[in-house]
């Protein structure tokens, strides 16, 4: 039977999951939405309350964006305007201007923001991605607890899982 190729039997069992590759996955985020929230706030300070109702600094994926948002919150709380100059000056005083990308990066944030009018939608995207990242984190914690129950029963583990997921739902 020359020329006959071996026949590949259809796979009937699910492929084994490669847990080593799980560590290579990039958590969900939207750098563009984060940039547009920050840039939009520099363009329109009046939208602060809309944004602050939706996101907190921990919702931002990148450390520089978390620092920028935190500094914006400080400016807002002190009654100072949030714009390129005041934000850069405040970050410089905190010793963080270079670590967030410098003056040029802050300028790009406001310059590249599509529209400050859509800032609530951008903030919703940032929050949505943060919730999904938290779900992933909790799922990993639950899996770790299952692999190493430390004497806990399955009921204890279910209670743990339920409380952790419920905490996300409440936030």
Per-segment meaning from a language model:
Residues 103-171:
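Extended, charged alpha-helical coiled-coil/arm scaffolds that mediate oligomerization and mechanical coupling
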Residues 1-131:
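Noncatalytic partner-interaction/assembly domains of nucleic-acid and motor enzyme complexes
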């Amino acid at each position: 039977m020359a020329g006959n190729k071996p026949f590949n039997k259809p796979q009937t069992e699910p492929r084994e999951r490669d847990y080593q590759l799980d560590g290579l996955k990039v958590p969900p985020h939207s750098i563009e939405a984060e940039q547009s929230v920050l840039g939009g706030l520099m363009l329109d300070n009046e939208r602060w309350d809309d944004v602050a109702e939706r996101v907190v600094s921990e919702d931002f994926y990148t450390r520089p964006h978390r620092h920028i948002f935190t500094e914006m919150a400080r400016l807002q709380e002190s009654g100072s305007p949030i714009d390129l100059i005041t934000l850069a000056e405040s970050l410089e005083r905190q010793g963080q201007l270079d670590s967030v990308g410098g003056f040029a990066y802050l300028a790009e944030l406001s310059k590249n923001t599509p529209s400050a009018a859509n800032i609530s939608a951008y903030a919703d995207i940032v929050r949505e991605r943060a919730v999904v990242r938290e779900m992933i984190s909790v799922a990993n914690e639950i899996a770790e607890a299952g692999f190493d129950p430390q004497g806990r029963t399955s009921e204890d583990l279910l209670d743990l899982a339920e409380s952790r997921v419920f905490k996300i739902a409440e936030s």
